[in-house]
C-alpha cells in the first residue's frame, strides 16, 4: 500500500465539521473512480506530550489517505491537476478550507 499523510490547519472561519464533510464527499468521489483506496479519520494534534518532537511544523490536523500502490496515487494526481470537472469543484471544496498544507508520502515495505 502507498500512503499520504496530510498535515494542515483550517482557514479562519472554517469548522472541522465543514472540512470533514467536504473531505468525505471528495473521498467517495475518488473511490468511485478507483483513484483512492481509503481515507482515515481526521486527527487533532496533541503537542503537549513529550512524544511530539516535531518543532518544525505547527499543524493542528492530520489524516492519512491510502492508495493501493504508487500508480493509483499518481493517477489521482493526474485526475486533479488539469482542474477540470467533475473533479475540480469537489477537490476545491476541500482544498479551499485548508491553510499551510504539507503532504508526506510513503510505501509499505
Model-flagged regions — what are they?
Residues 13-19, 71-75:
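Short, conserved charged micro-motifs
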Residues 44-52:
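Carbohydrate-binding/catalytic loop surfaces
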Residues 10, 15-17, 84-86:
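Charged, amphipathic alpha-helical segments and their flanking helix caps
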Amino acid at each position: 500500500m502507498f500512503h499520504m499523510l496530510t498535515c494542515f490547519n483550517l482557514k479562519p472561519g472554517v469548522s472541522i465539521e465543514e472540512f470533514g464533510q467536504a473531505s468525505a464527499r471528495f473521498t467517495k468521489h475518488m473511490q468511485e473512480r478507483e483513484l483512492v483506496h481509503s481515507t482515515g479519520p481526521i486527527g487533532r494534534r496533541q503537542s503537549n506530550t513529550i512524544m511530539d518532537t516535531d518543532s518544525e511544523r505547527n499543524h493542528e490536523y492530520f489524516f492519512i489517505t491510502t492508495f493501493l500502490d504508487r500508480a493509483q496515487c499518481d493517477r489521482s494526481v493526474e485526475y486533479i491537476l488539469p482542474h477540470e470537472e467533475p473533479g475540480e469543484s469537489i477537490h476545491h471544496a476541500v482544498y479551499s478550507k485548508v491553510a499551510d498544507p504539507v503532504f508526506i508520502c510513503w510505501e509499505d515495505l
